[in-house]
Amino acid sequence: VNARGGAGGKPIELVTLDDANDRKTAGANTQKLLTANNAVALFGYASATLSLDAMPQADKAGVLFFAPFSGANPVRQAPPVVFTVRASYADELEKMLAFWTGLGAKQVVVVHYDDEVGKQNLAVVVEYLKKQAKTPAAFSIARNAKLDASNFAQLMALKPDVIISTVLSGPAAEISKQIVARGSFVPTSSLSFVGAQQYIAAAGEAAAGVSITQVVPNPSSRAPIVTECAKAMQEAGMTQPMNSTHLEACIGAKVLTEAMRRAKKPGDARSLLAAMQNLGRYDTGGFVVNYAPGQNHGSKFVELAMVSRDGKLRN
């Protein structure tokens, strides 16, 4: 964008601060970005937890808070300055539950974190299955906790027909490896939150057969936005293959710069916020977002993909 003269004739400056995956640090960084750096938009916070202390600050300042990497309720039910480019976790969970219950699964076990977001994910499953007179079993774990053989035994004692995993790649991969090591087979689906490529790398051969929801096109597809983002990242010096997280970030960046281009006052936070609110339907190149006053969540796109034996994600 800057190579073409910027947005509205003004170059875009990207200021990046490391939050070390810590909520308090993310909140402190937000204050610095809003005060010392006079940010006109906050972009790409890595989770709902890291967004919790940042969103109220953005709301108070009237600054756009755009494209957090989360579909959790705290982000979906956030202040009016918060806009997303991805489907909600509820959308993802309903997609996988419709698939498995349609195949006759009765005992659904939800693996979730024992925090606010994890409990909300469990609640979505409870509400969905209530319509079918079913009740899921819950298996909660602490964030950053290591799973051992006793944890796995507790999980398997729940006798799952299917495991719905809402945790990150580390524990999700450990569960898959434990299942395979014991000669068992339990159908498993993970939220996009797992990080598909990170999970596949961590689980190795044990990832085969696991399904993962995707909220952006497959990074190996021929969608124009995939080609465009892969080229942009290569030109930026990235050597590893583009994954779903990279693609989601790139889509977010394209939508954000389009709103900047349409803003009536380039470089003005409130003008940018108004441009985003009135962006309407925007096709990024095979991935469509749609915003309007009162409609801050641009997409409900969800696909269910499966990991093949060669470690590829297949739709």
Which ranges hold each PLM region?
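Periplasmic-binding protein-like
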Residues: L33-A46, F66-P68, V109-H112, K159-S169, ...
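Beta-alpha junction/loop-to-helix N-cap segments that form part of ligand/metal-binding clefts
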Residues: R4-R76, I141-D148, G170-A173
